[in-house]
């Protein structure tokens, strides 16, 4: 299941790329900018700003899951079925109710990917799998990567690597570049902020490096979590000394995804303001350069 295909991307690997976003993630990062990607199933998004006062179409279409409330709709999400999702989106005249998640075959996705092959060839671009976590759907990920390789298309995967190694290993021959998150090297803060296990990520990174795969490390910098010199040094040291990568990207925290939490009726448990730490960003770049890495800041 996917939730988006983005063509003409220039920020998810080299050149012009098509990014396929797969649903499902094994982490629960507090700052996640794509909360609609976490579940492997479809999600219902509700935008109260588009809801028409006095309209009862959705409540009539699915009275067991929709109730009118003072400030819009009360949705009993735990009761939603695929049939409800279809009925609700079909009846809503303003698209206040929309569904995130679509089942597509490898052939359907590749039809879209192949349309832009001339642009990939000219720019050094290709296909990027993102998410969510692409390796939460290992068979689909491998099929798309293999089909792209057979078509002569460069492949990249944006991944948190918080999955069993057996989900990753079969796809290795078909992956040209890993855009790998390295959020923290210490297990306690990693667990607190992502509900995950840092050791699993570090172990998978070491295995990728041992396999000779090209890796670009990506570091989201979040105040209160890892936006400090000690954490930045530890992450950079691991990337340089343990993985021997050549490139690291620092991604300052932003709040562009907050509205998605409202649409999903989810709490937002991350800082409410973007990271404002120019001195830290300067330090991160300078320290990475001292360690022999090419460092880039990405917004």
Swiss-Prot record:
Q: How is the cofactor bound?
A: Binds 1 [4Fe-4S] cluster. The cluster is coordinated with 3 cysteines and an exchangeable S-adenosyl-L-methionine.
Q: Which Gene3D superfamilies match?
A: Aldolase class I
Task: Report residues binding S-adenosyl-L-methionine.
Answer: 31-33, 132, 181-183, 254
Its Gene Ontology cellular component terms are: cytoplasm
For this UniProt record, give its keywords in alphabetical order, as a comma-separated list. Answer: 4Fe-4S, Cytoplasm, Iron, Iron-sulfur, Metal-binding, Oxidoreductase, S-adenosyl-L-methionine
Q: Which residues bind [4Fe-4S] cluster?
A: 25, 29, 32
Position of the signal peptide: none
Under Enzyme Commission nomenclature, its number is 1.97.1.4
The top EC class, named as a word, is oxidoreductase
Could you say which cofactors this protein requires?
Answer: [4Fe-4S] cluster
Q: Which residues form the Radical SAM core domain?
A: 11-290
User: Where does the protein principally reside?
Assistant: cytoplasm
GO molecular function terms listed in the Swiss-Prot or TrEMBL record:
4 iron, 4 sulfur cluster binding; [formate-C-acetyltransferase]-activating enzyme activity; metal ion binding
* Compartment list: Cytoplasm
Record field: catalytic activity? glycyl-[formate C-acetyltransferase] + reduced [flavodoxin] + S-adenosyl-L-methionine = glycin-2-yl radical-[formate C-acetyltransferase] + semiquinone [flavodoxin] + 5'-deoxyadenosine + L-methionine + H(+)
Describe the function of this protein: Activation of pyruvate formate-lyase 2 under anaerobic conditions by generation of an organic free radical, using S-adenosylmethionine and reduced flavodoxin as cosubstrates to produce 5'-deoxy-adenosine.
Q: Which family does the record assign?
A: Belongs to the organic radical-activating enzymes family.
Kindly give the PANTHER family that the UniProt entry links to this protein.
PYRUVATE FORMATE-LYASE 3-ACTIVATING ENZYME-RELATED (PTHR30352:SF14), PYRUVATE FORMATE-LYASE-ACTIVATING ENZYME (PTHR30352)
Spell out the protein name for this chain: Putative pyruvate formate-lyase 3-activating enzyme
Species this protein is from = Escherichia coli (strain K12)
């Amino acid at each position: 299941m996917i939730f988006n295909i983005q063509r003409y991307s220039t920020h998810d690997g080299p050149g012009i790329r098509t990014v396929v976003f797969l649903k499902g993630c094994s982490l629960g990062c507090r700052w996640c900018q794509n909360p609609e990607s976490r579940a492997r199933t479809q999600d219902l998004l509700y935008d109260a700003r588009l809801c028409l006062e006095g309209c009862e179409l959705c409540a009539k279409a699915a009275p067991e899951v929709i109730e009118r409330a003072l400030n819009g709709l009360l949705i009993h999400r735990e009761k939603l079925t695929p049939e409800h999702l279809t009925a609700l989106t079909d009846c809503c005249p303003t698209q206040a109710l929309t569904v995130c998640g679509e089942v597509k075959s490898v052939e359907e996705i590749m039809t879209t990917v192949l349309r832009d092959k001339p642009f990939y060839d000219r720019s050094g671009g290709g296909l990027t799998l993102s998410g969510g976590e692409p390796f939460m759907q290992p068979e689909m990920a491998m099929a798309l990567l293999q089909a792209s390789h057979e078509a002569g298309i460069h492949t990249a995967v944006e991944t948190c690597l918080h999955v069993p190694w057996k989900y990753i290993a079969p796809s290795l021959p078909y992956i040209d570049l890993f855009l790998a998150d390295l959020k923290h090297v210490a297990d306690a803060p990693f667990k607190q902020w992502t509900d995950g296990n840092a050791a699993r990520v570090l172990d998978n990174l070491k295995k990728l490096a041992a396999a000779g795969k090209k890796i670009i490390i990506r570091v989201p910098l979040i105040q209160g979590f890892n936006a400090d010199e000690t954490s930045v040094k530890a992450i950079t040291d691991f990337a340089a000394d343990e993985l021997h990568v050549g490139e690291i990207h620092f991604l300052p925290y932003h709040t562009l995804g907050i509205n998605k939490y409202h649409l999903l009726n989810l709490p937002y448990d991350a800082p409410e303001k973007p990271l404002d730490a120019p001195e830290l960003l300067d330090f991160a770049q300078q320290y990475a350069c001292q360690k022999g890495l090419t460092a880039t800041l990405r917004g």
